[in-house]
From Swiss-Prot:
Its EC number is 7.1.1.-. It is a multi-pass membrane protein. Disulfide bonds: none annotated. NDH-1 is composed of 14 different subunits. Subunits NuoA, H, J, K, L, M, N constitute the membrane sector of the complex. It comes from Ruegeria sp. (strain TM1040) (Silicibacter sp.). One of its GO terms (cellular component) is plasma membrane. This is NADH-quinone oxidoreductase subunit H. The gene is nuoH. PANTHER family: NADH DEHYDROGENASE SUBUNIT 1, NADH-UBIQUINONE OXIDOREDUCTASE CHAIN 1. InterPro entries: NADH_UbQ_OxRdtase_su1/FPO (IPR001694), NADH_UbQ_OxRdtase_su1_CS (IPR018086).
Length: 345
């Protein structure tokens, strides 16, 4: 049996099993993310939230998903049927395949490539195509305006995210997530993590992730008071479910990136406790809690304020920080906190 797994067929079986495990983890997490999002929002507003289906309403998300699946798929007259159906599928698939390079410890990763950051950045940049396709194919003014907003918003904040990530790459000398996490390992526990030397960028990265994933207060592409529901106006049933699932999976991915880049990934925050994938999951859950709290307590920005923040505040500050980190890493300022060459770079 052991010899079989060394053959091409056995290797294919292992890869398939690993892929299914990652998909299962993301999809099961998705159910709890939606439930948690609704519960947190309800708690802030002093409501109960989901509490009928299952114990404490835990099965409410499953019931809602089944409701969407059994509904009829309504395609508007005059729309491009092929593109209309492909749009939500594109958003969902692109959100899923980004997880191929996300590690949960030194060995629990589907594809441990040396350009993992570049891969995630490229895939997340492509997700805007699903939104644009959905807005254009609907043949309606509100979806089209929402898709244009989304394209401009995502492109604007991807620049800031990219520059912030470059700062981490300069400190580590690698684009591999495993190397970045190992560079944050040390006897000081959480004080070895990159949140300390890159402290200002943690806030910019988190806010940029909110804008990148169209989360409040930056949910302009689907602003109900202005665009009804934006690019999702004409969608119902399974296509709408795919759009929503893709959005939450992208949010969870940003939580994973924040954990890996700045908070040590699977590393323990205290030296006397062992490192574990559970630390990674706990950190991701904490950052999703912050996503949900921001949604519950902040008002929506105006579109011009959103774009001004991205281009006139975040972009210059991120660019200045990259230059600063480059010099700090080159000359090993601050006791070498910005120069942790885990790969011998």
């Amino acid at each position: 049996m052991a010899e079989f797994f060394n053959t091409p067929g056995g290797i294919a079986v292992i890869i398939l099993a690993q892929t299914l495990a990652v998909v299962a983890f993301v999809m099961i997490s998705l159910l709890f993310l939606v439930y948690g999002d609704r519960k947190i929002w309800a708690a802030v507003q002093m409501r109960r939230g989901p509490n009928v289906v299952g114990v404490y309403g835990l099965l409410q998300t499953v019931a809602d998903a089944l409701k969407y699946v059994v509904k009829e798929v309504v395609i508007p007259a005059g729309s491009d049927r092929t593109v209309f159906i492909l749009a939500p599928l594109t958003s969902f698939v692109l959100a899923m395949i980004a997880w191929a390079v996300i590690p949960f410890n030194d060995t629990w990763v589907l594809s441990d490539i040396n350009v993992a950051i570049l891969y995630v950045f490229a895939v997340s940049s492509l997700e805007v195509y699903g939104v644009i396709m959905g807005g254009w194919a609907s043949n309606s003014k509100y979806p089209f305006l929402g898709s244009l907003r989304s394209a401009a918003q995502m492109i604007s904040y991807e620049v800031s995210i990219g520059l912030i990530i470059i700062g981490v790459i300069l400190s580590t000398g690698s684009m591999n997530f495993g190397d970045i996490v190992r560079a944050q390992d040390g006897d000081a526990g959480l004080f070895n993590w990159y949140w300390l030397p890159h402290f200002p960028m943690v806030f910019l990265f988190f806010i940029s992730c909110l804008a990148e994933t169209n989360r409040p207060p930056f949910d302009l592409p689907e602003a109900e008071s202005e665009l009804v529901a934006g690019y999702q106006v004409e969608y119902s049933s399974t296509p709408f479910l795919l759009f929503m699932a893709g959005e939450y999976i992208a949010i969870f991915l940003m939580c994973a990136l924040t954990s890996l880049l700045f908070f040590g990934g699977w590393l323990s925050p205290v030296p006397f406790l062992p490192d574990s994938p559970l630390w990674m999951v706990a950190k991701m859950a904490f950052f999703f809690f912050l996503f949900a709290m921001v949604k519950a307590i902040t008002p929506r920005y105006r579109y011009d304020q959103l774009m001004r923040l991205g281009w006139k505040v975040f972009l210059p500050f991120s660019l200045i920080w990259v230059v600063f980190v480059a010099f700090a890493a080159r000359f090993e300022w601050f006791w070498g906190a910005f120069a942790r060459w885990s790969t011998g770079g």
